Amino acid sequence: MQIKAHCKINIGLNILRRREDGYHDIETIMVPVRGLYDEIEVAATEGDSIAFEQSGIVVDCPAEKNLCVRAARLMQERYGIGGVSIKLDKRVPFGAGLGGGSADATAIIVAINEIYALGLTKERMAELAAELGSDTPFFVYDEAMICRGRGEVMTPIEVPLRGLWLAVVKPMNEGVSTAEAYGGVTPRLPERGLEELVSTPISKWREGIVNDFEPHIFKAHPRIAEIKAMLYDKGATYAAMSGSGSALFGIFEERPTITDDDDTFVHIEQM
């Protein structure tokens, strides 16, 4: 079975409070990016082994710790399925805040549900995905969602992006860990929620829709801040860092002219 694991962007990211379990309550809007994805081939095999091959972008991670393998192992533990062969063509940059690894994990759960005819509902697959990451359940539904709690409490939301252009830019030599992102943030309660703000014209988003990680990440990684400024210089109506970074995105009325080089990864698509 061939499956495309689409990545996502975050429109706004409010860090509301630190919880007793060590996680943070957040509010964010996740939007799928249809044209930027990892390609994964999944097949059932005899026995109970998990075979994993990876091509494309090189990720310095032992196979047993890869989210694809962890997702397959979770499905074996819960449902007693047989072996699984996974071939991952990695195209989504990692350490970017685009959810590439989470999308891969969810794709494995969805694929195994189909090839082993488990009959799981989307709700059940989302519960399983939540065991592998806070944003992982989003990729079961693959539609715009406002996400609360750790990110796993999701409600569909209309985001007026159809027909507009999206540019995703990641500095290749800059990565931001989740620990670094949360380590420098001060939780706060915003005056206006994202559900209200995203319903305003996109030209107004710059005034109110923010990513709470940006101030300290930009201070520690000036190159990331420079890319956001570049997106506005190129004519973006709205630009922001996605998730915990280091990727940024810009929303444009017309196709922007942004070229990639040895220093940056660039993806452009019409939404």
PLM region spans:
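Short hydrophobic/aromatic beta-strand micro-patches
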Residues: 249-251
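Conserved, helical-rich catalytic subdomain that frames metal- and/or nucleotide-binding sites
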Residues: 141-142, 146-238, 253-263, 268-271
